[in-house]
Amino acid sequence: MKLYNTLTRKKEEFIPLEEGKVRMYACGPTVYNYFHIGNARTFMVFDALRRYLIYRGYDVTFVQNFTDVDDKIIRRANEEGVAPEEISERFIKEYFYDAGTLGIEKADIHPKVTENMAEIIAFVAKLVEKGHAYESNGDVYFDVSKYEEYGKLSKQSLEDLQAGARIEINEYKKNPLDFALWKSAKAGEPSWESPWGNGRPGWHIECSAMAKRYLGETIDIHGGGGDLVFPHHENEIAQSEACSGKKFANYWLHVGYLNVDNKKMSKSLNNFFTPREISEEFDLENLRFFMLSAHYRNPINFSRDLLEAAKNGLDRLYTGKNNLEYLLENAAEREVSEEEKNFIHGLQSFKNQFIDAVDDDFNTADGIAVIFDLVREINSHISEKNSKKAVEASYDLLMELTGVLGLLKREAEDLEEEIERLIAERQQARKDKNFALSDKIRDDLKEKGIVLEDTAQGVKWRKL
């Protein structure tokens, strides 16, 4: 498997630190609001990458943090007249809800900044002790001039960065590029005791400290959105490597922007959509399919027309799945013919093509193209005349390859929730004496193969 490493600007063979194991960290959200679908793209890519690494036989430990103390959280808390932790806890819950609707599984560990304060303070103290950071009026800054490789991730020299740095009035910093590791307390803001007085951590140090605590001083894969290359990830490398004297991460992966009218989707431009807004028009699995149908490093221009096209593509895969499920229910346990044996053997080539495609810098777009080729092959060879074994082999491979990407998961659980929702809607219609709507819901469900039975214990349903 090869991955494009932002650090080296080239594809490299993926060789984990420890054979068969992967330690991966992705920067998570600052929890002051609902995340938008531009953020969702990054979360989905790392979710799918983790699934694929597991599929390829790796034991993956995946960490994605929550930034639960931040200026934006404090600002919103003040606007609403509540404590900052009330805001962060609310939007952590909302994150998990929205992530779930997009098929994003929970990371192995979701650390919060506020639960790792001792580790953060110890990290800052070590940097001060080693001469890489200095205290100034209750703040602690990282001394960029003491880290010679600063700029290696973003491919910028220290001289160029200094020349381009905005002239800011900060008498406490030695250099405009020096960044805060610890910020002294302000009235009315959350703070923690430290050797430099009460305060709270800077943004960059949080991820370094949590990655070290949960994954070690050197990790396999670190990543996030493309907007994090500089300064966030650049600063993480500087402080982590200055602290440990070791390489921080072997592979740096960054996800391309999701654009609207060729401009990056962002809250600051107010050109964003949340998953909840998209769900008013589309099943959110269509959004996942749309995102994974492009290479993760390429920017995507978002539009409803493109999402509609993605829906049509995903519908074709569902049609293939549904056809095979119908054939499975009706297939005869007959002997496998020689032609079928050749067909079943030939299915392996699609699995190999899929792995070859996705192994090449996690190219899910080409992987999905292989899945469509597989469906076409199945459609041209499988019918009611085939043995159950041939149908099963086709179905199993389709579900295996789509499952790796978290696709074709709708049915089962989602179907049950939808049925229960429609039953509740029908009950309300009957209470309101809206019998036309009540009958329509019953008939619509019957068309989908679901029969409702009114009993003394309430409405029950069964499949035809």
Swiss-Prot record:
Sorted alphabetically, which keywords does the UniProt record give? Aminoacyl-tRNA synthetase, ATP-binding, Cytoplasm, Ligase, Metal-binding, Nucleotide-binding, Protein biosynthesis, Zinc
Q: Which reaction does it catalyse?
A: tRNA(Cys) + L-cysteine + ATP = L-cysteinyl-tRNA(Cys) + AMP + diphosphate
Task: Kindly give the SUPFAM superfamilies that the UniProt entry links to this protein.
Answer: Anticodon-binding domain of a subclass of class I aminoacyl-tRNA synthetases, Nucleotidylyl transferase
Q: Which residues hold ATP?
A: K267
Question: Which CDD domains has this protein been placed in?
Answer: CysRS_core (cd00672)
Ranges spanned by the short sequence motif 'HIGH' region, renumbered to the chain: 29-39
Cofactor binding: number and manner: Binds 1 zinc ion per subunit.
Q: Which GO terms describe its biological process?
A: cysteinyl-tRNA aminoacylation
Q: Name one Pfam family in it.
A: CysS_C
Q: Give EC number(s), comma-separated.
A: 6.1.1.16
Q: Which InterPro entries match?
A: Cys-tRNA-ligase (IPR015803), Cys-tRNA-synt_Ia_DALR (IPR015273), Cys-tRNA/MSH_ligase (IPR024909), CysS_C (IPR056411), Rossmann-like_a/b/a_fold (IPR014729), tRNA-synt_1_cat_dom (IPR032678), tRNAsynth_Ia_anticodon-bd (IPR009080)
Q: Is the keyword Transcription in the record? A: no
Cofactors, names only:
Zn(2+)
GO molecular function terms attached to this record? ATP binding; cysteine-tRNA ligase activity; zinc ion binding
Q: Which residues are noted in the entry as Zn(2+)-binding?
A: C27, C207, H232, E236
Q: Which GO terms describe its cellular component?
A: cytosol
On assembly, the entry states: Monomer.
- What family name appears in the similarity comment? Belongs to the class-I aminoacyl-tRNA synthetase family.
Designated name of the protein: Cysteine--tRNA ligase
Q: Which gene encodes it?
A: cysS
